[in-house]
Regions:
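A short, highly charged nucleic-acid-interacting micro-segment common to nuclease
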Residues: 1-17, 37-40, 105
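Catalytic cores of nucleic-acid endonucleases
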Residues: 2, 19, 23, 57-248, ...
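Generic hydrophobic/packing signal
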Residues: 4, 11-12, 48-49, 61-65
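Generic structural microfeature
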Residues: 10, 56-57
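A short acidic/basic microdomain associated with nuclease active sites
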Residues: 17-53
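Charge-dense, extended regions
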Residues: 227-293
């Protein structure tokens, strides 16, 4: 079906006003359809359909995912985490990362040499946070969520009001941004195909109850004196100078609150204090960690 946006548009074309389909054994006619939008960010619903039969009206709010899509959320921020997990988002993320904290403590932090996909000269600032529908990489695990919380993640139940009450074809519609169906089949060729292949989100969660997280390193590249932006970090490396040695401390209790710039500036401050410019200047006399490769 081609790229993601084109696939969405094609589905909406199938669901144009006046289109007829059978749903739950009854014939319906589309009254309104469109892509819900809001001022900032995106609702969970990709395709909104209001249809009526001779007896009732139905709102079909579809979250469309490509079949091979691994990411549920790949640029997690504090704001987005609260919208996905609700008010307990800090505890939820901290519990998930501390459940695999041994893996974090095993990680190399200073790369005097290139290692796997980490370039020579890197020093780790912390780890970004991603949500996936399957396990991904070494620093990955299962989110500790109830079935109801997983439903909330897929449906968008905790989204801010502007994302929940999104605009469809110029009119604000209550809860239009909260999805109630998921569609993961790209091979749809008619309105009836869409209806037949979409799955109620609660039913989807019963079949796929697990959501996974993966943590990807954000590194300060000492030779280039750069890092990849002010990304929120689920686990931070709090660098310090103790007894004239560069010492790391892993911090798990401030997920996504502390960002890359703050950690990088702290690291650079203590590197300068110890007359360290690149990893070539780090040795057994000025290093307070054995996590060096």
């Amino acid at each position: 079906m081609g790229d993601f946006g084109a696939a969405e548009r094609r589905i909406l074309e199938f669901m144009s006003k006046g289109t007829e389909f059978v749903f739950n054994g009854k014939g319906y006619t589309v009254m309104l359809s469109g892509k819900p939008t809001c001022h900032k960010g995106e609702p969970k619903t990709d395709i909104y359909i209001l249809a009526e039969s001779c007896e009732d009206e139905v709102e079909i709010k579809i979250s469309y995912k490509k079949e091979n899509a691994d990411f549920i959320e790949n640029k997690m921020s504090a704001e987005r985490a609260e919208q996905l997990f609700g008010e307990d988002w800090i505890d939820i993320i901290e519990q998930s990362t501390t459940a695999i904290q041994d893996k974090f403590y095993e990680r190399m932090l200073i790369y005097k040499n290139g290692f796997r996909r980490t370039e020579k000269g890197s020093i780790t600032l912390g780890w970004k946070f991603e949500l996936l529908n399957k396990s991904g990489g070494d620093l990955s695990g299962k989110m500790l969520l109830t079935d109801e919380q997983v439903v909330d993640v897929y449906a968008g139940s905790n989204l801010s009001s502007d994302k929940k009450n999104a605009s469809v074809c110029g009119q604000t519609i209550r809860d239009s941004g909260v999805a109630n169906y998921i569609l993961m089949d790209e091979n749809v060729y008619s309105a009836q195909d869409v209806i037949d292949k979409m799955i109620p989100i609660r039913e989807y969660v019963m079949m796929h109850p697990d959501i996974y997280f993966a943590c990807k390193a954000l590194n300060y590249r000492t030779f280039a004196e750069k890092w990849d932006g002010n990304r929120p970090l689920s686990v931070q490396v709090n660098w310090d100078a103790i007894n004239n040695r560069l010492v790391p401390e892993l911090v798990f209790d401030k997920p996504l609150i502390v960002k890359g710039d703050e950690v990088a500036e702290r690291l650079i401050h203590y590197m300068r204090k110890l007359n360290i410019r690149t990893t070539e200047d780090i040795d057994e006399d000025n290093s307070g960690t054995d996590k060096i490769v």
